[in-house]
């Protein structure tokens, strides 16, 4: 075993000491499961398909229950070579559950053969499994028996094949040339026609004829290429069907064709307002695979850039929410403030919206001279501006009347639908990953987590974001005053790009540098996982390495996906005007939903 392999192996854990493993074995027997050792930081348990629902129900009813289905997706295992000790599987499905009371997770996995891809739907236990199962079916082909509406979600209705299978082409050049004939165009248009009967909706009752209205996919209040079909009785929303996927670019498939290093720019585009925030979970997950511990200076720099982008995103969210309610002026103020943030970001990284600046083992380069003055000027400017936003718009009686009590829900509903971020904290649940599960040194910062009073409505959600802005300014102040000295890269063989000085010794070091930069670093075969508190909720990367220069499987869990699935539950019985306010209060962009 090399030193590098030994360092990586020390991070691999089976979590047999986790109390939930004992609880499961006491209930189902010591031989009922296969526990997988990974670097996810989470117990990973392979469950028999026949026991899946029983195990899920058991976990949900424990004294300190696993109350949230955080993620659900699949993997094509057929080409995976490093599977020692795991159940035989052509495909697998994983279920990631969170216990808020324990502040712990568990991941259940089910092995499937290519000839039998059926398993029971999880929607009977967790309603938010609906969209996750639809996406897993269309990407891999697993059939979830009992699912209420197992149809395509991200891909067009006419699409054939399952794109995340290993035998499905990954590049446009592997397909035949695209041709849009008149017949194909007519077929695509017909496929987009909404048929209420397909969704269990009635066109009329004895006394009422319902109207069906398309909002989007090109509408300013839909905040992107997003379509929602409304079933209306007058102006009252009887039901609705969100239609997503117009922004889907195959981000997870791209992860299988890019090196660990060259995939970093793609992470910026997942939630395109978040910039470096998007890079954080990816590089942390890769560093777990590699066994890299970064210097303190790197941690603080990463936190500083993340909080700058958090403020930038929140400013746009707050101002566009106010605009959706009917006031235009704050948007122009917000863009002035965001320009100041971009000036700081550009001076540090060289780019503005999508810096692609974090690196495996560090950051691209050290902080430039004068960065502290730019940040100081911004910190002197921003608090007064926040006060003006609050005084001029957010305390406005019309805005309060339009948003308070609108699209309201409690803690149980938020957990049932996988809500995170301000949407969850507005219900009174104090769960911010920066505090609950600190990463990148957040445990060293002094800041508060704003929490609501028990009900998450449009007004509470936006006001929590205002207070989050103030807390981000506190964190930035501490970054400015306590920036550590030291290197901006870890001294580790898998740090990418490696330190340039090593290339100047002899031909061997030059070759090593060349291979790592051109082909990319080779990560140890294992699995890793990292969640962070992103701008819109919890974002996570679940990476599987098969000992190659590229990821075997890249799973990206975004908060906006879960939040849009919840829309029908939140707005049934509301007016169309209330829906517009609710869409503005969610804080989403479609790239974050569709990936």
UniProtKB/Swiss-Prot annotation:
Q: Does the entry feature the keyword NAD, yes or no? A: yes
Q: Which domain of life is it from?
A: Bacteria
Any one GO MF annotation of this record: quinone binding
Record field: catalytic activity = a quinone + NADH + 5 H(+)(in) = a quinol + NAD(+) + 4 H(+)(out)
EC number of the protein: 7.1.1.-
Its localization reads:
Cell inner membrane
Give the span(s) annotated as NADH dehydrogenase I subunit D.
Answer: 209-595
Topology class, membrane: Peripheral membrane protein
Q: Name one Pfam family in it.
A: Complex1_49kDa
Q: What keywords tag this UniProt record?
A: Cell inner membrane, Cell membrane, Membrane, Multifunctional enzyme, NAD, Quinone, Translocase, Transport, Ubiquinone
Top EC class for this record:
translocase
Alphabetical GO CC annotations of the entry are: NADH dehydrogenase complex; plasma membrane
Residue ranges, annotated region (NADH dehydrogenase I subunit C): 1-185
InterPro entries, per this entry? NADH_DH_suC, NADH_DH_suCD, NADH_Q_OxRdtase_suD, NADH_quin_OxRdtase_su_C/D-like, NADH_UbQ_OxRdtase_30kDa_su, NADH_UbQ_OxRdtase_49kDa_CS, NDH1_su_D/H, NiFe-Hase_large
Instruction: Indicate the family of this protein.
Output: In the N-terminal section; belongs to the complex I 30 kDa subunit family.
Binding partners and assembly:
NDH-1 is composed of 13 different subunits. Subunits NuoB, CD, E, F, and G constitute the peripheral sector of the complex.
Q: What does this protein do?
A: NDH-1 shuttles electrons from NADH, via FMN and iron-sulfur (Fe-S) centers, to quinones in the respiratory chain. The immediate electron acceptor for the enzyme in this species is believed to be ubiquinone. Couples the redox reaction to proton translocation (for every two electrons transferred, four hydrogen ions are translocated across the cytoplasmic membrane), and thus conserves the redox energy in a proton gradient.
Its name, as the record gives it, is: NADH-quinone oxidoreductase subunit C/D
């Amino acid at each position: 075993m090399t030193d590098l392999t030994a360092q990586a192996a020390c991070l691999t854990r089976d979590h047999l000491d986790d109390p939930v493993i004992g609880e499961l074995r006491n209930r189902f027997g010591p031989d009922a499961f296969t526990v997988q050792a990974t670097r996810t930081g989470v117990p990973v348990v392979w469950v028999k398909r026949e026991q899946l629902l029983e195990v899920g129900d058991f976990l949900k009813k424990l004294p300190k229950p696993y109350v949230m289905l955080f993620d659900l997706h699949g993997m094509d295992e057929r080409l995976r070579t490093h599977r020692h000790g795991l159940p035989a599987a052509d495909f697998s499905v994983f279920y990631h559950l969170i216990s808020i009371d324990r502040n712990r997770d568990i991941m259940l996995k089910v092995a499937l053969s290519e000839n039998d891809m059926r398993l029971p739907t999880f929607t009977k236990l967790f309603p938010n499994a609906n969209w996750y199962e639809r996406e897993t079916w269309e990407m891999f082909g697993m059939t979830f028996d009992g699912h209420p509406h197992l149809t395509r979600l991200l891909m067009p209705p006419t699409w054939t094949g399952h794109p995340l299978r290993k035998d499905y082409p990954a590049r446009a050049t592997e397909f035949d040339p695209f041709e849009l004939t008149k017949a194909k165009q007519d077929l695509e248009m017909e496929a987009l026609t909404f048929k209420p009967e397909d969704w269990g909706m009635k066109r009329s009752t004895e006394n009422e004829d319902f109207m069906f209205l398309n909002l989007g996919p090109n509408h300013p209040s839909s905040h992107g290429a997003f379509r929602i079909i409304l079933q209306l009785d007058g102006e009252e929303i009887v039901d609705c069907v969100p239609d997503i996927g117009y922004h889907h670019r195959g981000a997870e498939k791209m992860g299988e064709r890019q090196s660990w290093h060259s995939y970093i720019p793609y992470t910026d585009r997942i939630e395109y307002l978040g910039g470096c925030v998007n890079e954080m979970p990816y590089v942390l997950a890769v560093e777990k695979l590699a066994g890299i511990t970064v210097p303190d200076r790197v941690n603080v720099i990463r936190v500083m850039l993340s909080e700058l982008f958090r403020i930038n995103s929140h400013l746009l969210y707050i101002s566009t929410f106010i605009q959706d309610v009917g006031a235009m002026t704050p948007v122009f103020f917000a863009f002035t403030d965001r320009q100041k943030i971009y000036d700081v970001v550009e001076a540090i990284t060289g780019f503005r919206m999508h810096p692609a600046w974090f690196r495996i083992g560090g950051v691209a380069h050290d902080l430039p001279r004068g960065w502290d003055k730019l940040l100081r000027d911004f910190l002197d400017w921003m608090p007064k501006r926040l006060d003006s936003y609050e005084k001029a718009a957010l305390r406005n009686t019309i805005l309060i009347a339009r948003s308070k009590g609108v699209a309201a829900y409690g803690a149980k509903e938020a957990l049932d639908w996988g809500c995170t971020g301000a949407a969850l904290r507005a219900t009174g649940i104090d769960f911010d990953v920066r505090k609950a599960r600190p990463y990148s040194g957040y445990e060293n910062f002094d800041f508060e987590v704003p929490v609501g009073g028990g009900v998450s409505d449009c007004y509470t959600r936006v006001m929590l974001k205002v207070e989050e802005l103030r807390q981000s300014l506190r964190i930035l102040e501490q970054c400015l005053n306590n920036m550590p000295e030291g290197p901006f890269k870890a001294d580790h063989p898998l740090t990418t790009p490696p330190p340039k000085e090593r290339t100047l010794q002899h031909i061997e070091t030059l070759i090593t540098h060349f291979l790592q930069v051109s082909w990319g670093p080779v990560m140890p075969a294992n699995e890793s996982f990292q969640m962070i508190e992103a701008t819109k909720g919890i974002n996570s990367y679940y990476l599987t390495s098969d000992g190659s220069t590229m990821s075997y499987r890249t799973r990206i869990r975004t908060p906006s996906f879960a939040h849009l699935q919840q829309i029908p539950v939140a707005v049934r019985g509301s007016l169309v005007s209330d829906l517009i306010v609710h869409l503005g209060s969610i804080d989403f962009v479609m790239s974050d939903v569709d990936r």
